[in-house]
């Protein structure tokens, strides 16, 4: 009986990539798997066809022979499904593709993988810093309780002079298998808990865990401009890996204290400065604090309460951008609440001045009021 073209079976072009072939086989294997189609000979046959086609096209050498000589080039002239010696071979590729997802092993006698390397857990450290540390950057030392390999047993968990023994229940595989239809499902061994070995003489220092707790000092550079909620990732400073797996990461989560002088708006800083209504009317020069030194700010005549002056590049640096925010000086005009009799008289006289009076006369009166209030 003539055989269908392997590319046709998988529904891919002859120049299909390895990933295309794998995706096509995955789709067909799920669609026609016997467990999904019980008592359906046609579905079982299509499952075998897909497995045989994938077996050839996934292998570069077999595929080259097939492309040149057809089915004769791969030694399969007996019809689909005849290229495998047992059901184990037919299900082997299915296990390769889906095993990591579902824990499936192949049919009877499938491969034992044993315990796999596992990455260590990530750790979180909450760090509170001052506003000035956040603004200028700093280097801080963290004291971290961490699990480290036991120096008594070298991390094996076994007492010195002994070593872990192969688990007799699973034969060192770390897994036991349960049959369900065509599948064997790999389960962690309940005796060794997936380790493949058991410790008969635990290390007295770590009690067989292979790890001990130590306080580790770690120097961390805080970049200038950080804000509450920012995270610093320190690779490899988390919990150690298992079975040779990589260590996890340490995430330092920043919390910035409030400042008595400045308020923060993103990378801009806001500072409030109070002036008298005389200063607001006539203008003045006032000192304004910055992150470095005080600077002098010219207040123009007629300044209103709530007016904001922007000092460029006097704010906080942007992380990773090389730019700096601004300093916003918010003016608050203070109205006196307690006046002497003379001050009150001068204010009333000031209020009676017509708008048509010469400006110099108004300014002269304002200066006179300011002098009376001790603001000159």
Swiss-Prot record:
UniProt keyword Transport, yes or no: no
Source taxon at top rank: Bacteria
Pfam families registered for this protein in UniProt: DnaJ, DnaJ_C, DnaJ_CXXCXGXG
PROSITE patterns attached to this UniProt entry: DNAJ_1, DNAJ_2, ZF_CR
Keywords of the record: Chaperone, Cytoplasm, DNA replication, Metal-binding, Repeat, Stress response, Zinc, Zinc-finger
GO cellular component, one term: cytoplasm
Entry binding sites for Zn(2+) 1: 150, 153, 203, 206
Domain J: 5-70
Cofactor: Zn(2+)
Cofactor note text: Binds 2 Zn(2+) ions per monomer.
UniProt-listed GO biological process terms: chaperone cofactor-dependent protein refolding; DNA replication; protein refolding; response to heat
One Gene Ontology MF term: ATP binding
Family annotation (PANTHER family): CHAPERONE PROTEIN DNAJ A6, CHLOROPLASTIC, DNAJ HOMOLOG 1, MITOCHONDRIAL-RELATED
Subunit and interaction comment: Homodimer.
Entry note about domains: The J domain is necessary and sufficient to stimulate DnaK ATPase activity. Zinc center 1 plays an important role in the autonomous, DnaK-independent chaperone activity of DnaJ. Zinc center 2 is essential for interaction with DnaK and for DnaJ activity.
Name by which UniProt lists this protein: Chaperone protein DnaJ
Gene this protein is translated from: dnaJ
């Amino acid at each position: 009986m003539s055989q269908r073209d392997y590319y046709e079976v998988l529904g891919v072009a002859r120049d299909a990539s390895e990933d295309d072939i794998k995706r096509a086989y995955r789709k067909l294997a799920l669609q026609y798997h016997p467990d999904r189609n019980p008592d359906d000979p046609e579905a079982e046959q299509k499952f075998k066809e897909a497995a045989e086609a994938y077996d050839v096209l996934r292998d570069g050498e077999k595929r080259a022979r097939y492309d040149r000589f057809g089915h004769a080039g791969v030694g399969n002239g007996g019809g689909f499904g005849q290229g495998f010696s047992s059901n184990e071979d037919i299900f082997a590729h299915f296990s390769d593709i889906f095993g990591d997802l579902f824990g499936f092993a192949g049919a009877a006698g499938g491969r034992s993988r044993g315990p796999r390397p596992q990455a260590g857990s990530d750790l979180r450290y909450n760090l509170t810093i001052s506003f000035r540390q956040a603004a200028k950057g700093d280097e801080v030392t963290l004291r971290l309780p961490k699990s480290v390999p036991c120096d008594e047993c070298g991390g094996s968990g076994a007492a010195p002079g002994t070593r872990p023994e192969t688990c007799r229940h699973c034969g060192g595989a770390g897994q036991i298998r349960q049959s369900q239809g065509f599948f064997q499902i790999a389960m962690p061994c309940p005796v060794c808990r997936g380790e493949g070995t058991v410790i008969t003489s635990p290390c007295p220092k770590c009690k067989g865990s292979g790890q001990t707790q130590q306080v580790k000092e770690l120097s961390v550079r805080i970049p200038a401009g950080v804000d509450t909620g920012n995270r610093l990732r320190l690779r490899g400073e988390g919990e150690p890996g298992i079975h040779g797996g990589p260590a996890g990461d340490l995430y330092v989560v920043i919390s910035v204290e409030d400042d008595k002088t400045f308020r923060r708006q993103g990378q801009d800083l806001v500072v409030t400065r109070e002036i008298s209504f005389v200063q607001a009317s006539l203008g003045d020069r006032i000192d304004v604090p910055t992150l470095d030194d005080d600077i002098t700010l010219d207040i123009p005549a007629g300044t209103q309460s709530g007016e904001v002056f922007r000092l460029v590049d006097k704010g906080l640096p942007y992380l990773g951008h090389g730019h700096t925010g601004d300093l916003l000086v918010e003016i608050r005009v203070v109205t006196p609440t307690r006046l002497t009799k003379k001050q009150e008289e001068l204010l009333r006289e000031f209020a009676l001045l017509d708008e048509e009076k010469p400006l110099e006369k108004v300014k002269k009166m304002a200066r006179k009021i300011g002098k009376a209030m001790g603001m000159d």
